[in-house]
């Protein structure tokens, strides 16, 4: 199990919008619980970036890495469309037959895994007659302002204008007809941007990559299971590399072409354990030392129980 948490200083980002009201594009916000100066709890609404958005960015990086490493990628995943074998119409495009019954579910899962590393690492849900689910091996949460630094988080709408000089707006000395709509010389729009000290957590269950999760029914073909086993090391490397690129490139989110954030990785903590463990979130500057203390205690607990 690989677990990590990071603190990032991000200025002027519009990575995750939720809706457009007229000419106003809103940033995603969510409620969090913080301590106030009187040491009591209160609710604050703050800018956030959803885990869905971050996971999409991770899987996009995973696709690119798998292509470079010669690992299999499905038809839709190769287009960065992560619908992941969810319906029969998509299965036919991927060349995979749906599960006939419960005994056929392992065969179906293994067919999907051998066809697409993204479905292996990121999970999938087939919603046909005999539904099949594979839980994602990558777990990411919302990127939120650090709870001890929520005063360093703000939202503001930025005013923008697109101007069409070559075809000025009709109306000034020229009446528009019924068939000729007025041309707008100015197009006004507002985009809400955020700045904050963000924290982001992620876990990667490396040991379960390239391992079928369905343990019942008729076993899958031995040749396909052997193929997964032979690719296991490469698939793990690809998943870990994509996680590293996610934090090093910050290639995740919306409006990167005109609202590329001014971002800086302040600190990061990473653990690798043989047992389930999640690092302490980067809500305060002491999260690295807190993680070290916790992982030492967890290791001691497993050793006393005779678990390495």
Where do the model's predicted regions map?
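Active/ligand-binding-proximal structured segments within catalytic/core domains
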Residues: 45-59
């Amino acid at each position: 199990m690989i677990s990590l948490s990071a603190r990032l200083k991000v200025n002027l980002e519009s990575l995750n919008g939720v809706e457009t009201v007229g000419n106003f594009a809103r940033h995603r916000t969510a409620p969090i619980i913080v301590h106030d100066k009187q040491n009591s709890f209160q609710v604050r609404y703050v800018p956030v970036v959803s885990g869905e958005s971050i996971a999409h960015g991770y899987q996009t990086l995973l696709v690119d890495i798998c292509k470079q490493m010669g690992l299999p990628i499905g038809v839709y995943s190769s287009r960065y469309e992560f619908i992941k074998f969810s319906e029969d119409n998509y299965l036919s495009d991927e060349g995979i037959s749906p599960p006939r019954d419960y005994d056929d579910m392992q065969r179906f899962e293994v067919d999907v895994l051998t066809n697409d590393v993204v479905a292996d690492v990121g999970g999938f849900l087939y919603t046909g007659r005999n539904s099949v689910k594979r839980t994602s091996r990558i777990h990411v949460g919302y990127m939120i302002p650090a709870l001890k630094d929520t005063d360093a988080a703000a939202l503001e709408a930025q005013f923008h204008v697109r101007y069409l000089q070559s075809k000025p707006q009709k109306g000034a000395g020229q009446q528009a007809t019924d068939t000729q709509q007025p041309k707008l010389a100015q197009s006004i729009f507002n985009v809400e941007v955020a700045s904050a000290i963000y924290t982001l957590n992620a876990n990667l269950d490396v040991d379960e990559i390239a391992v079928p999760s369905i343990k019942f029914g008729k076993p899958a073909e031995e040749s396909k299971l052997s193929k997964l086993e032979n690719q296991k090391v490469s698939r793990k490397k690809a998943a870990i590399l994509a996680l590293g690129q996610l934090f090093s490139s910050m290639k995740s989110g919306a409006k990167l072409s005109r609202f590329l954030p001014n971002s800086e990785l302040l600190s990061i903590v990473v653990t690798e354990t043989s047992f389930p463990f999640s690092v302490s979130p980067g809500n305060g500057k002491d999260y690295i030392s807190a993680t070290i203390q916790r992982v030492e205690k967890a290791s001691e607990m497993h050793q006393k129980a005779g678990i390495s």
